[in-house]
Design a protein with these regions (language model features):
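Intrinsically disordered, low-complexity, charged terminal extensions of DNA damage-control enzymes
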Residues: 1-43
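Catalytic cores of DNA base-excision repair glycosylases
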Residues: 73-191
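Alpha-helix initiation and N-capping motif
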Residues: 12, 23-26, 65, 164, ...
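A short secondary-structure junction motif
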Residues: 53-65, 93-102
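Short helix-loop boundary/capping segments at the starts of domains
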Residues: 25, 35, 57, 61-65, ...
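Long, charge-rich intrinsically disordered scaffolds of nucleic-acid metabolism proteins
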Residues: 46, 51-59, 87
Length: 191
């Protein structure tokens, strides 16, 4: 499994140049938010950790997700891996603030990793769409979560999460739309 290697994606500088040439709005945003904000792109190369964090953060505020995740991390004694999680009881996991469904999702993930039913290493050999489908077969992981894992854990360069509310709001704000843009407009920007 991937572990704690953090780095800015290798394609990042090339991508910034490409986007700057292609789109005036993107060019000004890239200039505006250039370093040190790029450190936001560094990622934790631990798929199990990232999937647990994704499950925990679903449908709650960022602040609540961070609080629950800190309790979860403490319960795991800072060792968030399948072997540690599988040993925790449902009651222990719920005491972190996890719902019954999230507990099931995290326990199921741990079981699938330990049984090798889920093999994170093969994702590196898959196309983006195949990887999204593969990740989406996990309990509590839908398309958006799979896209976020590919983008921030695997640092895939061509992920364009058209259902992401943050992306939609940013497009609306920066392209002077008075509404959240339709999927067709978001897809057009990706070309």
């Amino acid at each position: 499994m991937f572990h704690n290697m953090s780095k800015i994606p290798s394609y990042w500088n090339k991508a910034k140049k490409y986007l700057s040439k292609k789109d005036k709005t993107m060019s000004s945003l890239i200039k505006k938010y250039n370093s040190p904000s790029e450190t936001v792109l560094t990622s934790r190369k631990d798929v199990f950790y990232s999937l647990c964090k994704s499950i925990i953060g679903q449908q709650i505020s960022v602040a609540a997700a961070n609080a629950v995740f800190l309790k979860f991390k403490k319960k795991c004694k800072n060792k968030i891996n399948a072997k540690t999680v599988i040993k925790l009881s449902t009651i222990q996991l719920k005491s972190c603030g996890l719902s019954r469904q999230k507990v099931k999702g995290i326990k199921n993930l741990a079981q699938q990793v330990l049984s090798k039913e889920f093999k994170p290493r093969i994702i590196t050999k898959m196309s983006d769409e195949d990887a999204i489908i593969y990740l989406s077969q996990l309990r509590q992981i839908g398309r958006w979560s799979a896209e976020m894992i590919l983008l921030f854990t695997y640092n895939r360069p061509n992920i364009w999460p058209i259902q992401d509310i943050g992306l939609l709001r940013a497009i609306s704000k920066n392209y002077n739309k008075k509404y959240l843009p339709p999927e067709s407009y978001v897809s057009y920007l990706n070309k």
